[in-house]
């Protein structure tokens, strides 16, 4: 398991709330919590930036992290990430914040310590462009947007 430096920005982590951990052996994501001072509602159509109480420093340029939504929040309540996916570069050292957007029709209440998103570490390949006049032809070619059919 890879070790990542984490800085606790909110003293409630480790006391009132645990440090993020993997829920099961097969879990890909670590749950991030709303480390807010008091509960509040996100109104329909509204976006709020919510602190997690943590900052991380990945350091390894071959890794990044992504902040992803929790499936139940989106499916049941219409709560998704305001930026769809949050990308954390390996050299970023600032606080982890979650942009939450209520695309539902009802106000949604965020309580102190609610699990609001998940953090997943992913490998990174930095590419260098090679300028060419033409590509080697493939069977697919330029087919896209439904090219492979529905079934």
Swiss-Prot record:
Substrate binds at residues 70-72, 83, 87-89, 97. This enzyme is involved in nucleotide metabolism: it produces dUMP, the immediate precursor of thymidine nucleotides and it decreases the intracellular concentration of dUTP so that uracil cannot be incorporated into DNA. Belongs to the dUTPase family. GO terms for biological process: dUMP biosynthetic process; dUTP catabolic process. The gene is dut. The keyword Acetylation does not apply. Its EC number is 3.6.1.23. This is Deoxyuridine 5'-triphosphate nucleotidohydrolase.
């Amino acid at each position: 398991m890879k070790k990542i430096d984490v800085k606790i920005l909110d003293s409630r982590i480790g006391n009132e709330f645990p440090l993020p951990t993997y829920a099961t052996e097969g879990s890909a994501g670590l749950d991030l919590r709303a480390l807010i001072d008091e509960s509040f509602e996100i109104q329909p159509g509204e976006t709020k930036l919510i602190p997690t109480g943590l900052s991380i420093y990945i350091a390894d340029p071959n890794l990044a992290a992504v902040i992803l939504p929790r499936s139940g929040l989106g499916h049941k309540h219409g709560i998704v990430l305001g930026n769809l996916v949050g990308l954390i570069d390996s050299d970023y050292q600032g606080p982890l914040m979650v942009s939450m957007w209520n695309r539902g029709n009802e106000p949604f209440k965020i309580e102190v310590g609610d699990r609001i998103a998940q953090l997943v570490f992913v490998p990174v390949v930095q590419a260098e462009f090679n300028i060419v006049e033409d590509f080697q032809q493939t069977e697919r070619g330029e087919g896209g947007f439904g090219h492979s059919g529905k079934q």
